[in-house]
Regions:
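Membrane-interface helix-loop junctions and terminal tails of multi-pass membrane proteins
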Residues: 1-216
Length: 216
């Protein structure tokens, strides 16, 4: 059971980061128009999320995100002994994903990003992005994996545009994107603040979810 879940989370997380980073590199290679680059990156990520969640939901629940796993544990959706399995798979999968994306475009496997994303406003944006993601997942969870997949995909698509952080909303993805000096990269100087914001956003969502949404 653990092996099955590890593999599901690992593959899903790897493909998620390949989609995010790879589409960003492709867009960067094809145009210098920032809006067009972001649009291409957005569409690929939204489409990828929908397919990945639908494909892997029955294997592991398709978290691909330590913040999601944390909230799933606190709402008794997964057992304590699965936390390490999930989070390790997510981190390792995301790291493999960024290396493969870099490799496919003939870039160094690992290259620290120089893309600075500073500011308290961005911290708040990332907190809001993660809060919204968790809230939407639990708002649609009882409607089935297709509903969750569609909701998450369209929310992240919107999040790329309405948040100044471009809605990472995922600590494992934020960490992985430190290792690509391309359109979707983030400087290691800013990664910790993103991760802290994401954890706070997830915990705030958990608090609200327990008040207004049945988690049984």
């Amino acid at each position: 059971m653990k092996n099955k879940m590890f593999i599901g989370e690992f593959i899903g997380s790897a493909f998620l980061v390949m989609i995010i980073v790879g589409s960003g590199i492709m867009a960067q290679n094809l145009t210098r128009d920032f809006a067009v680059m972001l649009l291409a990156n957005t569409l690929a990520t939204g489409a990828g999320l929908f397919v990945l969640i639908n494909s892997i939901a029955d294997i592991s629940g398709a978290h691909f995100n330590p913040a999601v796993t944390m909230v799933m544990y606190f709402t008794k959706k997964i057992k304590k002994d699965l936390i390490l399995t999930y989070i390790s798979a997510q981190i390792l999968g995301c790291l493999l994903g960024v290396m493969l994306a870099n490799f496919m475009f003939e870039l160094p496997l690992i290259e620290l990003s120089k893309k600075v994303r500073p500011g308290f406003n961005i911290f708040i944006a990332e907190l809001i992005a993660t809060f919204g993601l968790i809230f939407i997942i639990f708002g649609t969870l009882k409607k089935g994996s297709t509903s969750v997949a569609a909701s998450v995909a369209t929310y992240i698509t919107a999040g790329y545009w309405f948040t100044s952080s471009t809605s990472f909303a995922n600590p494992a993805v934020a960490l992985a994107r430190t290792f690509t000096d391309t359109f979707t990269g983030i400087s290691y100087l800013n990664t910790p603040s993103y991760i802290v914001a994401e954890i706070i956003g997830a915990l705030l969502a958990l608090f609200i979810i327990k008040k207004i949404i049945s988690t049984k």
